[in-house]
Amino acid sequence: NHFFDEAGYIEELKALKPEAIMCRTEPITAAMMDAAGPNLKVIGKQGAGLDNIDIAAATERKIRVVYAPGQNAQSVAEQAAFLMLACARRYNYVDRQFRSGNYKVRFGLTNTYELQGKTLGLVGCGRIGRMLATIAKCGFGMNVIGYDPFLKQEQLGDLITLVESQDEVFKQADFVSLHTPLTPETEHSIGMREFKLMKPTASFINASRGEVVNEAELIQAMQENVITCAGLDVTEK
């Protein structure tokens, strides 16, 4: 977190001695818990994912941790849909050209396309993945495939067609959208190997956690035209 000031928070917590801490993306460290003192009973996370809270430290101190899964799922799904549109229409490039006075840029664009009939591939088919699938399938007429080791086809109906492996998502999709939590197993689990599986015309969307992706390898994949576009709602740092 660019704005995280642990020392400042520690001083405030020492003064306040709170019974509860509410956070969103700010890290909650063991030192901060100790600064709050024995009054601290609960830490609340606004949203899903607990990777910014030291769960082991909270458990050791008998501090309850609660969160709100699904609280912002619709917003994240809509953001992912926007990023798909931005990639398909080369939104950032066209915007920069217009702002510089190049109003004829549209006549030279050859790699923009519609979403209808394209394939969206989901890595993770939880709440956000299913909401994005609904937008893509019902709103844009896209085909939707997905990989999720914790779900079976009957749980998804005809909304998402599950494939046998994550690799198949990367191979088949025109848009790969990442919706997985950050865990020791998923950290940097997406890199050049996965990007090289993708179609050279495909786009990569990440609206989950930045650290799941090896960012240096994503930049390299873009620079070497391994994939066409990346739409990022999150970054590593």
Describe the role of every protein-language-model region.
Residues N1-V66, G191:
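An N-terminal-biased, well-structured beta-alpha scaffold segment characteristic
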Residues H2, Q46-L50, G70-A73, F150, ...:
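Short, acidic/turn-prone active-site loops that include or flank metal/cofactor-
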Residues P69-T119, M131-G139:
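Phosphate-binding beta-alpha-beta segment of Rossmann-like dinucleotide-binding domains, i.e.
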Residues C125-G126:
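Glycine-rich Rossmann-fold phosphate-binding loop(s) that bind the pyrophosphate
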